Protein backbone atom coordinates (compact mmCIF):
# COMPACT_ATOMS: atom_id res chain seq x y z
CA UNK A 1 0.00 0.00 0.00
CA UNK A 2 1.50 3.30 -1.13
CA UNK A 3 -0.11 5.59 1.43
CA UNK A 4 1.43 3.70 4.35
CA UNK A 5 4.86 4.65 2.97
CA UNK A 6 4.10 8.34 2.48
CA UNK A 7 5.81 10.55 5.03
CA UNK A 8 5.89 13.57 2.72
CA UNK A 9 3.94 14.46 -0.43
CA UNK A 10 7.28 14.60 -2.26
CA UNK A 11 6.86 10.81 -2.47
CA UNK A 12 4.21 11.35 -5.14
CA UNK A 13 6.60 13.06 -7.54
CA UNK A 14 8.31 9.77 -8.31
CA UNK A 15 5.09 8.02 -9.35
CA UNK A 16 3.57 7.62 -12.80
CA UNK A 17 -0.07 8.29 -13.65
CA UNK A 18 -1.17 4.71 -13.05
CA UNK A 19 0.45 4.75 -9.63
CA UNK A 20 -1.07 8.14 -8.79
CA UNK A 21 -4.51 6.72 -9.52
CA UNK A 22 -3.75 3.82 -7.19
CA UNK A 23 -2.78 6.34 -4.51
CA UNK A 24 -6.10 8.10 -5.08
CA UNK A 25 -8.01 4.84 -4.69
CA UNK A 26 -6.11 4.00 -1.51
CA UNK A 27 -6.70 7.49 -0.16
CA UNK A 28 -10.42 7.26 -0.84
CA UNK A 29 -10.61 3.91 0.93
CA UNK A 30 -8.65 5.33 3.86
CA UNK A 31 -11.06 8.25 4.15
CA UNK A 32 -14.00 5.85 4.01
CA UNK A 33 -12.39 3.63 6.64
CA UNK A 34 -12.07 6.58 8.99
CA UNK A 35 -15.50 8.11 8.54
CA UNK A 36 -17.26 4.74 8.68
CA UNK A 37 -15.69 4.02 12.08
CA UNK A 38 -15.20 7.50 13.51
CA UNK A 39 -17.70 9.71 11.70
CA UNK A 40 -16.87 12.98 10.02
CA UNK A 41 -17.19 14.85 6.74
CA UNK A 42 -17.80 12.32 4.00
CA UNK A 43 -18.99 13.82 0.71
CA UNK A 44 -16.70 16.87 0.51
CA UNK A 45 -13.57 14.81 1.17
CA UNK A 46 -14.43 12.02 -1.25
CA UNK A 47 -14.96 14.56 -4.02
CA UNK A 48 -11.54 16.17 -3.53
CA UNK A 49 -9.29 13.10 -3.47
CA UNK A 50 -8.00 13.34 -7.04
CA UNK A 51 -7.49 17.09 -6.77
CA UNK A 52 -5.42 16.62 -3.61
CA UNK A 53 -3.20 14.00 -5.24
CA UNK A 54 -2.67 16.30 -8.22
CA UNK A 55 -1.99 19.34 -6.02
CA UNK A 56 0.72 17.55 -4.07
CA UNK A 57 2.17 16.08 -7.27
CA UNK A 58 2.48 19.48 -8.98
CA UNK A 59 3.18 21.86 -6.11
CA UNK A 60 5.95 21.71 -3.55
CA UNK A 61 4.49 21.75 -0.05
CA UNK A 62 5.55 22.81 2.50
CA UNK A 63 7.35 25.53 0.51
CA UNK A 64 4.16 26.17 -1.45
CA UNK A 65 1.32 27.04 0.92
CA UNK A 66 -2.06 25.30 0.79
CA UNK A 67 -4.87 27.03 2.66
CA UNK A 68 -8.03 24.96 3.07
CA UNK A 69 -11.37 26.66 3.51
CA UNK A 70 -13.56 25.27 6.34
CA UNK A 71 -11.46 22.03 6.24
CA UNK A 72 -14.29 19.89 4.92
CA UNK A 73 -12.00 18.62 2.16
CA UNK A 74 -8.71 18.25 4.06
CA UNK A 75 -8.77 14.50 4.88
CA UNK A 76 -6.97 13.43 1.66
CA UNK A 77 -4.35 16.11 2.36
CA UNK A 78 -3.77 14.57 5.79
CA UNK A 79 -3.38 11.09 4.32
CA UNK A 80 -0.75 12.38 1.88
CA UNK A 81 1.23 14.34 4.48
CA UNK A 82 2.25 11.49 6.75
CA UNK A 83 -0.93 11.03 8.74
CA UNK A 84 -2.38 7.92 7.10
CA UNK A 85 -2.36 6.09 10.44
CA UNK A 86 -5.24 8.31 11.53
CA UNK A 87 -7.27 6.85 8.68
CA UNK A 88 -6.09 3.24 8.60
CA UNK A 89 -5.64 2.42 12.28
CA UNK A 90 -8.02 1.85 15.14
CA UNK A 91 -10.34 4.43 16.63
CA UNK A 92 -7.67 5.56 19.11
CA UNK A 93 -5.34 6.32 16.19
CA UNK A 94 -8.17 8.22 14.54
CA UNK A 95 -8.83 10.25 17.67
CA UNK A 96 -5.27 11.56 17.43
CA UNK A 97 -6.06 13.23 14.10
CA UNK A 98 -8.33 16.27 13.98
CA UNK A 99 -11.10 16.50 11.43
CA UNK A 100 -9.88 19.98 10.53
CA UNK A 101 -6.73 21.69 9.28
CA UNK A 102 -4.52 21.92 12.36
CA UNK A 103 -1.01 23.36 12.72
CA UNK A 104 -0.98 22.03 16.28
CA UNK A 105 -1.14 18.58 14.73
CA UNK A 106 1.09 19.17 11.69
CA UNK A 107 2.72 22.62 11.54
CA UNK A 108 4.69 21.75 8.42
CA UNK A 109 1.70 21.17 6.15
CA UNK A 110 -1.34 22.69 7.91
CA UNK A 111 -0.96 26.45 7.85
CA UNK A 112 -4.02 27.49 9.86
CA UNK A 113 -6.57 26.16 12.33
CA UNK A 114 -9.67 26.35 10.16
CA UNK A 115 -13.23 25.21 10.76
CA UNK A 116 -15.48 28.16 9.93
CA UNK A 117 -16.18 28.94 6.33
CA UNK A 118 -15.23 31.50 3.67
CA UNK A 119 -11.84 32.32 5.23
CA UNK A 120 -9.25 30.67 2.97
CA UNK A 121 -8.82 33.45 0.42
CA UNK A 122 -8.46 36.10 3.12
CA UNK A 123 -5.89 34.00 4.97
CA UNK A 124 -4.05 33.35 1.72
CA UNK A 125 -3.87 37.06 0.90
CA UNK A 126 -1.95 37.52 4.14
CA UNK A 127 0.57 34.90 3.02
CA UNK A 128 0.59 36.54 -0.41
CA UNK A 129 1.49 39.92 1.08
CA UNK A 130 4.14 38.37 3.34
CA UNK A 131 5.76 36.61 0.38
CA UNK A 132 5.76 39.81 -1.67
CA UNK A 133 7.35 41.82 1.13
CA UNK A 134 10.03 39.19 1.74
CA UNK A 135 10.72 38.69 -1.97
CA UNK A 136 10.32 34.90 -1.92
CA UNK A 137 8.72 32.84 -4.68
CA UNK A 138 6.41 30.26 -3.12
CA UNK A 139 2.99 29.55 -4.60
CA UNK A 140 0.06 30.59 -2.43
CA UNK A 141 -2.98 28.37 -3.03
CA UNK A 142 -6.40 28.95 -1.47
CA UNK A 143 -8.86 26.06 -1.75
CA UNK A 144 -12.52 26.99 -1.42
CA UNK A 145 -15.75 25.16 -2.17
CA UNK A 146 -18.58 26.71 -4.13
CA UNK A 147 -20.75 26.65 -1.00
CA UNK A 148 -18.24 28.79 0.88
CA UNK A 149 -18.48 31.47 -1.80
CA UNK A 150 -21.81 32.51 -0.29
CA UNK A 151 -19.95 33.96 2.71
CA UNK A 152 -19.06 37.64 2.61
CA UNK A 153 -15.45 37.13 3.70
CA UNK A 154 -14.82 35.19 0.49
CA UNK A 155 -15.85 38.29 -1.47
CA UNK A 156 -13.54 40.44 0.64
CA UNK A 157 -10.67 38.02 0.03
CA UNK A 158 -11.22 38.01 -3.72
CA UNK A 159 -11.33 41.79 -3.70
CA UNK A 160 -8.03 42.08 -1.82
CA UNK A 161 -6.28 39.38 -3.85
CA UNK A 162 -7.17 41.28 -7.01
CA UNK A 163 -6.00 44.55 -5.47
CA UNK A 164 -2.62 43.05 -4.51
CA UNK A 165 -2.31 41.92 -8.11
CA UNK A 166 0.46 39.38 -7.55
CA UNK A 167 0.51 35.61 -7.80
CA UNK A 168 -2.17 33.77 -5.89
CA UNK A 169 -4.09 30.70 -6.99
CA UNK A 170 -7.69 30.22 -5.89
CA UNK A 171 -8.99 26.72 -6.54
CA UNK A 172 -12.78 26.69 -6.59
CA UNK A 173 -13.95 23.17 -5.82
CA UNK A 174 -17.40 23.29 -7.42
CA UNK A 175 -19.49 20.26 -6.50
CA UNK A 176 -22.79 22.16 -6.93
CA UNK A 177 -23.50 21.86 -3.22
CA UNK A 178 -23.07 23.54 0.10
CA UNK A 179 -24.09 21.29 2.99
CA UNK A 180 -27.45 21.25 1.26
CA UNK A 181 -28.22 22.98 -2.03
CA UNK A 182 -26.57 26.33 -2.76
CA UNK A 183 -28.44 29.61 -2.39
CA UNK A 184 -27.48 32.96 -3.86
CA UNK A 185 -27.18 34.81 -7.13
CA UNK A 186 -23.53 33.88 -7.68
CA UNK A 187 -24.57 30.29 -8.32
CA UNK A 188 -26.35 31.29 -11.51
CA UNK A 189 -22.98 32.38 -12.88
CA UNK A 190 -21.22 29.26 -11.61
CA UNK A 191 -23.85 27.16 -13.38
CA UNK A 192 -23.39 29.16 -16.59
CA UNK A 193 -19.63 28.66 -16.34
CA UNK A 194 -20.10 24.91 -15.91
CA UNK A 195 -22.56 24.64 -18.77
CA UNK A 196 -20.29 26.61 -21.11
CA UNK A 197 -17.11 24.89 -19.89
CA UNK A 198 -15.89 28.22 -18.60
CA UNK A 199 -16.48 30.20 -21.79
CA UNK A 200 -19.68 32.14 -21.07
CA UNK A 201 -19.59 35.89 -21.66
CA UNK A 202 -20.23 36.91 -18.07
CA UNK A 203 -17.50 35.53 -15.82
CA UNK A 204 -17.71 36.54 -12.19
CA UNK A 205 -14.05 35.83 -11.51
CA UNK A 206 -12.76 37.75 -14.51
CA UNK A 207 -14.86 40.70 -13.35
CA UNK A 208 -12.86 40.61 -10.11
CA UNK A 209 -9.66 40.85 -12.16
CA UNK A 210 -8.58 37.20 -12.04
CA UNK A 211 -7.08 35.03 -14.72
CA UNK A 212 -9.44 32.09 -15.11
CA UNK A 213 -9.19 28.43 -16.05
CA UNK A 214 -12.00 25.88 -16.02
CA UNK A 215 -11.76 22.10 -15.75
CA UNK A 216 -14.86 19.98 -16.20
CA UNK A 217 -13.13 16.72 -15.26
CA UNK A 218 -12.43 17.66 -11.66
CA UNK A 219 -12.03 14.03 -10.60
CA UNK A 220 -9.50 13.18 -13.33
CA UNK A 221 -5.93 13.23 -12.04
CA UNK A 222 -4.30 13.57 -15.46
CA UNK A 223 -6.42 16.62 -16.35
CA UNK A 224 -5.92 18.13 -12.91
CA UNK A 225 -2.15 17.81 -13.16
CA UNK A 226 -2.26 19.53 -16.53
CA UNK A 227 -4.26 22.53 -15.30
CA UNK A 228 -2.29 22.89 -12.07
CA UNK A 229 1.01 22.82 -13.98
CA UNK A 230 -0.32 25.60 -16.22
CA UNK A 231 -0.77 27.98 -13.28
CA UNK A 232 2.20 27.00 -11.13
CA UNK A 233 4.45 30.01 -10.66
CA UNK A 234 1.86 32.51 -11.90
CA UNK A 235 2.49 36.15 -11.07
CA UNK A 236 -1.19 37.10 -11.36
CA UNK A 237 -4.32 36.41 -9.28
CA UNK A 238 -5.70 33.23 -10.87
CA UNK A 239 -8.81 31.13 -10.37
CA UNK A 240 -8.84 27.44 -11.27
CA UNK A 241 -12.48 26.37 -11.34
CA UNK A 242 -12.82 22.58 -11.12
CA UNK A 243 -16.11 20.71 -11.38
CA UNK A 244 -16.12 17.78 -8.94
CA UNK A 245 -18.67 15.30 -7.67
CA UNK A 246 -19.55 15.41 -3.99
CA UNK A 247 -19.21 11.90 -2.57
CA UNK A 248 -17.29 10.66 -5.62
CA UNK A 249 -16.48 6.96 -5.48
CA UNK A 250 -19.01 5.94 -2.83
CA UNK A 251 -22.49 5.26 -4.19
CA UNK A 252 -24.54 6.10 -1.05
CA UNK A 253 -22.79 9.48 -0.74
CA UNK A 254 -23.41 10.28 -4.40
CA UNK A 255 -27.07 9.24 -4.17
CA UNK A 256 -27.86 11.54 -1.22
CA UNK A 257 -25.31 14.33 -1.18
CA UNK A 258 -26.93 16.39 1.57
CA UNK A 259 -27.31 13.51 4.03
CA UNK A 260 -23.73 12.40 3.39
CA UNK A 261 -22.07 15.78 3.88
CA UNK A 262 -21.24 14.75 7.45
CA UNK A 263 -22.33 11.77 9.41
CA UNK A 264 -21.92 9.41 12.33
CA UNK A 265 -20.22 6.01 11.87
CA UNK A 266 -21.88 3.69 9.36
CA UNK A 267 -21.58 0.26 7.78
CA UNK A 268 -19.22 0.66 4.86
CA UNK A 269 -20.72 -2.10 2.74
CA UNK A 270 -24.09 -0.38 2.30
CA UNK A 271 -24.00 2.96 4.14
CA UNK A 272 -26.54 1.86 6.74
CA UNK A 273 -26.62 3.14 10.32
CA UNK A 274 -26.09 2.48 13.16
CA UNK A 275 -22.71 0.87 12.62
CA UNK A 276 -22.67 -2.78 13.64
CA UNK A 277 -20.73 -3.95 16.66
CA UNK A 278 -17.47 -5.83 16.07
CA UNK A 279 -19.36 -9.13 16.49
CA UNK A 280 -21.80 -8.17 13.74
CA UNK A 281 -24.76 -7.35 15.97
CA UNK A 282 -26.69 -4.11 15.61
CA UNK A 283 -26.59 -1.77 18.62
CA UNK A 284 -29.95 -1.45 20.32
CA UNK A 285 -30.78 2.21 20.57
CA UNK A 286 -34.10 3.60 21.68
CA UNK A 287 -35.61 6.27 19.44
CA UNK A 288 -34.83 9.68 20.87
CA UNK A 289 -36.56 12.99 20.45
CA UNK A 290 -34.47 15.86 19.15
CA UNK A 291 -35.14 19.57 19.21
CA UNK A 292 -34.54 19.99 15.48
CA UNK A 293 -37.41 17.68 14.58
CA UNK A 294 -39.65 19.09 17.30
CA UNK A 295 -38.90 22.66 16.23
CA UNK A 296 -39.48 22.12 12.52
CA UNK A 297 -42.72 20.22 13.14
CA UNK A 298 -43.94 23.00 15.45
CA UNK A 299 -42.97 25.69 12.96
CA UNK A 300 -44.76 23.97 10.09
CA UNK A 301 -47.95 23.74 12.15
CA UNK A 302 -47.71 27.39 13.16
CA UNK A 303 -46.94 28.49 9.60
CA UNK A 304 -50.34 27.26 8.47
CA UNK A 305 -51.96 29.75 10.84
CA UNK A 306 -49.42 32.57 10.51
CA UNK A 307 -48.24 33.35 6.99
CA UNK A 308 -45.79 35.92 8.37
CA UNK A 309 -43.83 33.26 10.28
CA UNK A 310 -40.53 32.61 8.49
CA UNK A 311 -37.92 29.96 9.29
CA UNK A 312 -34.45 31.24 8.45
CA UNK A 313 -31.29 29.14 8.16
CA UNK A 314 -27.78 30.03 7.02
CA UNK A 315 -26.40 27.04 5.19
CA UNK A 316 -27.29 24.56 7.96
CA UNK A 317 -31.00 23.72 7.56
CA UNK A 318 -30.49 20.45 9.43
CA UNK A 319 -29.78 22.48 12.59
CA UNK A 320 -33.42 23.54 12.48
CA UNK A 321 -34.69 20.11 11.47
CA UNK A 322 -35.68 21.41 8.04
CA UNK A 323 -35.07 18.42 5.80
CA UNK A 324 -35.65 18.64 2.05
CA UNK A 325 -39.28 17.55 2.48
CA UNK A 326 -39.91 20.09 5.22
CA UNK A 327 -38.26 22.87 3.22
CA UNK A 328 -40.54 22.05 0.34
CA UNK A 329 -43.58 22.01 2.63
CA UNK A 330 -42.67 25.40 4.09
CA UNK A 331 -42.20 26.90 0.63
CA UNK A 332 -41.67 30.65 0.81
CA UNK A 333 -41.89 30.52 4.60
CA UNK A 334 -38.43 28.96 4.77
CA UNK A 335 -35.36 30.75 3.50
CA UNK A 336 -31.78 29.55 3.52
CA UNK A 337 -29.44 32.42 2.75
CA UNK A 338 -26.25 30.38 2.37
CA UNK A 339 -23.30 30.38 4.71
CA UNK A 340 -23.74 34.06 5.47
CA UNK A 341 -24.56 34.69 9.11
CA UNK A 342 -23.96 38.45 8.78
CA UNK A 343 -26.63 38.57 6.09
CA UNK A 344 -28.96 36.46 8.24
CA UNK A 345 -28.74 38.76 11.27
CA UNK A 346 -29.35 41.89 9.23
CA UNK A 347 -32.05 40.27 7.11
CA UNK A 348 -34.14 39.09 10.05
CA UNK A 349 -34.00 42.64 11.40
CA UNK A 350 -35.35 43.88 8.09
CA UNK A 351 -37.98 41.16 8.02
CA UNK A 352 -39.20 42.10 11.49
CA UNK A 353 -39.25 45.77 10.52
CA UNK A 354 -41.34 44.82 7.51
CA UNK A 355 -43.94 43.00 9.60
CA UNK A 356 -42.76 39.41 9.37
CA UNK A 357 -41.97 37.04 12.24
CA UNK A 358 -38.55 35.57 11.40
CA UNK A 359 -36.95 32.82 13.49
CA UNK A 360 -33.31 32.26 12.62
CA UNK A 361 -31.77 28.99 13.79
CA UNK A 362 -27.99 29.16 14.20
CA UNK A 363 -25.36 27.04 15.88
CA UNK A 364 -23.77 28.62 18.93
CA UNK A 365 -20.32 28.45 17.36
CA UNK A 366 -21.38 30.54 14.36
CA UNK A 367 -22.77 33.46 16.35
CA UNK A 368 -19.28 34.88 16.66
CA UNK A 369 -19.30 35.36 12.87
CA UNK A 370 -22.02 38.00 13.14
CA UNK A 371 -21.64 39.77 16.49
CA UNK A 372 -21.61 43.21 14.86
CA UNK A 373 -24.80 42.69 12.87
CA UNK A 374 -26.66 41.39 15.91
CA UNK A 375 -25.56 44.43 17.90
CA UNK A 376 -25.88 47.09 15.22
CA UNK A 377 -28.49 46.01 12.70
CA UNK A 378 -30.78 44.09 15.02
CA UNK A 379 -30.53 45.26 18.63
CA UNK A 380 -29.97 48.99 18.19
CA UNK A 381 -33.08 48.98 16.03
CA UNK A 382 -35.08 46.90 18.55
CA UNK A 383 -36.65 44.85 15.79
CA UNK A 384 -38.49 41.83 17.24
CA UNK A 385 -36.78 38.97 15.43
CA UNK A 386 -36.02 35.64 17.12
CA UNK A 387 -32.64 33.89 17.20
CA UNK A 388 -32.93 30.16 17.91
CA UNK A 389 -29.48 29.20 19.26
CA UNK A 390 -28.71 25.49 19.00
CA UNK A 391 -25.79 23.43 20.24
CA UNK A 392 -24.69 25.76 23.02
CA UNK A 393 -22.74 24.09 25.79
CA UNK A 394 -20.42 21.20 26.49
CA UNK A 395 -22.63 18.51 24.95
CA UNK A 396 -22.07 19.76 21.43
CA UNK A 397 -19.28 20.07 18.89
CA UNK A 398 -15.90 19.80 20.56
CA UNK A 399 -13.25 20.66 17.96
CA UNK A 400 -11.25 23.77 18.76
CA UNK A 401 -12.79 25.59 15.79
CA UNK A 402 -16.34 24.66 16.73
CA UNK A 403 -16.59 24.78 20.52
CA UNK A 404 -19.95 26.17 21.58
CA UNK A 405 -19.09 27.82 24.89
CA UNK A 406 -19.03 31.52 24.08
CA UNK A 407 -22.58 32.46 23.08
CA UNK A 408 -23.62 33.54 26.60
CA UNK A 409 -20.78 36.06 27.11
CA UNK A 410 -21.20 37.33 23.56
CA UNK A 411 -24.95 37.75 23.38
CA UNK A 412 -25.34 38.94 26.96
CA UNK A 413 -22.91 41.78 26.32
CA UNK A 414 -25.27 43.30 23.72
CA UNK A 415 -27.78 45.82 25.14
CA UNK A 416 -31.35 45.42 23.99
CA UNK A 417 -31.27 41.66 23.45
CA UNK A 418 -33.21 39.27 25.66
CA UNK A 419 -31.50 35.89 25.98
CA UNK A 420 -33.71 33.13 27.40
CA UNK A 421 -32.56 29.72 28.65
CA UNK A 422 -35.35 27.14 28.84
CA UNK A 423 -34.83 24.06 30.97
CA UNK A 424 -37.44 21.74 29.45
CA UNK A 425 -39.16 21.12 26.14
CA UNK A 426 -42.40 22.65 27.36
CA UNK A 427 -40.65 25.77 28.62
CA UNK A 428 -38.77 26.09 25.33
CA UNK A 429 -41.89 26.16 23.20
CA UNK A 430 -43.63 28.53 25.60
CA UNK A 431 -40.69 30.91 25.31
CA UNK A 432 -40.58 30.49 21.54
CA UNK A 433 -44.27 31.33 21.17
CA UNK A 434 -43.91 34.40 23.40
CA UNK A 435 -40.79 35.56 21.54
CA UNK A 436 -42.61 35.35 18.21
CA UNK A 437 -45.76 37.06 19.42
CA UNK A 438 -44.12 39.98 21.28
CA UNK A 439 -43.30 43.06 19.23
CA UNK A 440 -40.84 45.12 21.27
CA UNK A 441 -37.39 43.52 21.29
CA UNK A 442 -35.18 40.92 19.62
CA UNK A 443 -35.13 37.68 21.60
CA UNK A 444 -32.60 34.85 21.51
CA UNK A 445 -33.42 31.44 22.96
CA UNK A 446 -30.73 28.94 23.95
CA UNK A 447 -32.15 25.56 22.99
CA UNK A 448 -31.20 22.95 25.64
CA UNK A 449 -28.30 20.79 24.46
CA UNK A 450 -28.58 18.02 27.05
CA UNK A 451 -31.37 16.16 25.27
CA UNK A 452 -35.12 16.67 25.36
CA UNK A 453 -36.34 16.86 28.96
CA UNK A 454 -40.07 17.01 29.64
CA UNK A 455 -41.95 18.33 32.64
CA UNK A 456 -45.49 17.74 33.85
CA UNK A 457 -45.40 21.00 35.80
CA UNK A 458 -47.13 24.03 34.28
CA UNK A 459 -44.82 26.52 32.57
CA UNK A 460 -45.28 30.26 32.23
CA UNK A 461 -46.49 31.60 28.92
CA UNK A 462 -45.56 35.26 29.43
CA UNK A 463 -41.99 36.34 29.99
CA UNK A 464 -41.83 40.12 29.78
CA UNK A 465 -38.90 42.39 29.04
CA UNK A 466 -37.42 42.57 32.55
CA UNK A 467 -35.81 39.44 34.00
CA UNK A 468 -37.87 37.49 36.47
CA UNK A 469 -36.33 34.38 37.99
CA UNK A 470 -38.48 31.43 38.99
CA UNK A 471 -37.93 29.99 42.46
CA UNK A 472 -38.53 26.26 42.12
CA UNK A 473 -37.83 25.39 45.75
CA UNK A 474 -37.40 27.76 48.69
CA UNK A 475 -34.77 26.77 51.22
CA UNK A 476 -32.17 28.73 53.12
CA UNK A 477 -28.44 29.31 53.53
CA UNK A 478 -27.53 28.10 50.01
CA UNK A 479 -29.20 29.17 46.76
CA UNK A 480 -28.48 27.37 43.48
CA UNK A 481 -29.23 29.38 40.34
CA UNK A 482 -28.89 26.89 37.48
CA UNK A 483 -29.47 28.08 33.93
CA UNK A 484 -30.76 26.21 30.91
CA UNK A 485 -29.06 22.90 30.19
CA UNK A 486 -27.44 22.94 33.62
CA UNK A 487 -30.74 23.16 35.48
CA UNK A 488 -30.89 19.39 35.88
CA UNK A 489 -27.36 19.57 37.31
CA UNK A 490 -28.69 22.12 39.78
CA UNK A 491 -31.46 19.71 40.75
CA UNK A 492 -28.89 16.96 41.34
CA UNK A 493 -26.74 19.24 43.49
CA UNK A 494 -29.76 20.30 45.56
CA UNK A 495 -30.67 16.66 46.13
CA UNK A 496 -27.12 15.79 47.22
CA UNK A 497 -27.09 18.77 49.57
CA UNK A 498 -30.29 17.49 51.15
CA UNK A 499 -28.43 14.28 51.96
CA UNK A 500 -25.90 16.48 53.76
CA UNK A 501 -28.60 18.21 55.78
CA UNK A 502 -28.76 21.37 53.67
CA UNK A 503 -32.11 22.57 52.34
CA UNK A 504 -30.97 24.63 49.36
CA UNK A 505 -33.06 27.07 47.38
CA UNK A 506 -33.26 26.12 43.69
CA UNK A 507 -33.86 28.82 41.08
CA UNK A 508 -34.47 28.65 37.33
CA UNK A 509 -33.25 32.09 36.15
CA UNK A 510 -34.76 31.79 32.64
CA UNK A 511 -33.07 35.07 31.62
CA UNK A 512 -29.34 35.10 30.86
CA UNK A 513 -28.94 38.70 29.71
CA UNK A 514 -29.60 40.48 33.01
CA UNK A 515 -30.24 39.88 36.70
CA UNK A 516 -33.48 39.81 38.64
CA UNK A 517 -32.53 42.29 41.34
CA UNK A 518 -35.65 41.64 43.43
CA UNK A 519 -34.98 37.91 43.71
CA UNK A 520 -31.28 38.39 44.36
CA UNK A 521 -31.95 41.07 46.96
CA UNK A 522 -34.41 38.77 48.71
CA UNK A 523 -31.79 36.04 49.08
CA UNK A 524 -29.73 38.29 51.34
CA UNK A 525 -32.13 37.80 54.24
CA UNK A 526 -31.51 34.10 54.86
CA UNK A 527 -28.75 32.91 52.53
CA UNK A 528 -24.97 32.94 52.91
CA UNK A 529 -23.94 31.45 49.56
CA UNK A 530 -25.24 31.73 46.00
CA UNK A 531 -24.07 29.13 43.49
CA UNK A 532 -24.49 29.82 39.77
CA UNK A 533 -24.30 27.09 37.13
CA UNK A 534 -24.09 27.79 33.41
CA UNK A 535 -23.33 25.51 30.48
CA UNK A 536 -20.64 27.63 28.86
CA UNK A 537 -17.77 30.03 29.41
CA UNK A 538 -18.09 31.67 32.82
CA UNK A 539 -15.72 34.54 32.00
CA UNK A 540 -18.06 37.40 31.16
CA UNK A 541 -21.00 35.06 31.52
CA UNK A 542 -24.23 34.79 33.47
CA UNK A 543 -22.75 33.94 36.87
CA UNK A 544 -20.30 36.81 36.88
CA UNK A 545 -23.22 39.22 36.52
CA UNK A 546 -24.72 37.81 39.69
CA UNK A 547 -21.36 37.98 41.47
CA UNK A 548 -21.08 41.61 40.37
CA UNK A 549 -24.54 42.35 41.75
CA UNK A 550 -23.57 41.13 45.21
CA UNK A 551 -20.28 43.00 45.02
CA UNK A 552 -19.46 44.47 48.44
CA UNK A 553 -22.28 42.68 50.27
CA UNK A 554 -21.70 39.79 52.66
CA UNK A 555 -23.07 37.25 50.17
CA UNK A 556 -20.58 34.70 48.93
CA UNK A 557 -20.94 33.72 45.27
CA UNK A 558 -19.57 30.55 43.72
CA UNK A 559 -19.58 30.89 39.92
CA UNK A 560 -19.80 27.55 38.13
CA UNK A 561 -18.95 27.33 34.45
CA UNK A 562 -16.15 26.59 32.03
CA UNK A 563 -12.95 28.61 32.31
CA UNK A 564 -12.17 30.62 29.18
CA UNK A 565 -10.01 28.53 26.89
CA UNK A 566 -9.62 27.00 23.46
CA UNK A 567 -10.43 23.35 24.12
CA UNK A 568 -9.85 20.79 21.39
CA UNK A 569 -11.63 17.45 21.05
CA UNK A 570 -12.40 17.43 24.72
CA UNK A 571 -14.02 14.64 26.67
CA UNK A 572 -17.14 16.10 28.29
CA UNK A 573 -16.71 14.46 31.69
CA UNK A 574 -13.04 15.42 31.86
CA UNK A 575 -13.83 19.01 30.91
CA UNK A 576 -16.49 19.14 33.62
CA UNK A 577 -14.13 17.57 36.12
CA UNK A 578 -11.31 19.98 35.26
CA UNK A 579 -13.71 22.85 35.94
CA UNK A 580 -15.11 21.38 39.19
CA UNK A 581 -18.50 20.90 37.58
CA UNK A 582 -19.26 17.28 38.38
CA UNK A 583 -22.20 17.11 40.78
CA UNK A 584 -20.12 15.79 43.68
CA UNK A 585 -17.40 18.39 43.09
CA UNK A 586 -19.94 21.20 43.26
CA UNK A 587 -21.36 19.82 46.50
CA UNK A 588 -17.90 19.51 48.04
CA UNK A 589 -17.09 23.09 47.03
CA UNK A 590 -20.32 24.31 48.62
CA UNK A 591 -19.56 22.46 51.85
CA UNK A 592 -16.19 24.23 52.02
CA UNK A 593 -17.79 27.66 51.89
CA UNK A 594 -20.67 27.45 54.38
What are these regions (language model features)?
Residues 110-266, 272-274, 284-288, 293-295, ...:
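Glycine-rich ThDP/TPP pyrophosphate-binding loop and its adjacent helix/strand module
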Residues 29-36, 96-113, 135-141, 323-337, ...:
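Glycine/charged-rich beta-loop-alpha catalytic/anionic-binding loops adjacent to active sites
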Residues 87-97, 163-177, 379-391:
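A glycine-rich helix N-cap at a beta->alpha junction
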Residues 19-30, 80, 84-106, 314-329, ...:
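Acidic-glycine-rich active-site phosphate/pyrophosphate-binding loop
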Amino acid sequence: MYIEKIKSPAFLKGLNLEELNIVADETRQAVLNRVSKHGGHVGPNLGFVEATVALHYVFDAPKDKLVFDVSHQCYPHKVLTGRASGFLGNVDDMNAISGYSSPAECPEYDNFEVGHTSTSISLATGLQKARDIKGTDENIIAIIGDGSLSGGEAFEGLDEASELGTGIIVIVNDNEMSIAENHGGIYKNLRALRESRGTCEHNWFKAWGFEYKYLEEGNNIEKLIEVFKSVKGTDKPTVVHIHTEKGHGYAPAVANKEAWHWGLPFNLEDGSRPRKNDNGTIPQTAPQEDYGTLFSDWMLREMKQDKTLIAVTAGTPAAAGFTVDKRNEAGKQHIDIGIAEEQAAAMISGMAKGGLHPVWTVYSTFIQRTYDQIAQDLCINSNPAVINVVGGGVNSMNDITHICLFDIPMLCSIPGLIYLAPTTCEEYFAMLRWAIQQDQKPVAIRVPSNGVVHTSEPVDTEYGYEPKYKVIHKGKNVAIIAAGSFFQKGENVARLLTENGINATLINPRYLNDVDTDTLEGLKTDHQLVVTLEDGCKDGGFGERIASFYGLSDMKVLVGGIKKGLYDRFDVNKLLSDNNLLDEQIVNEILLHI
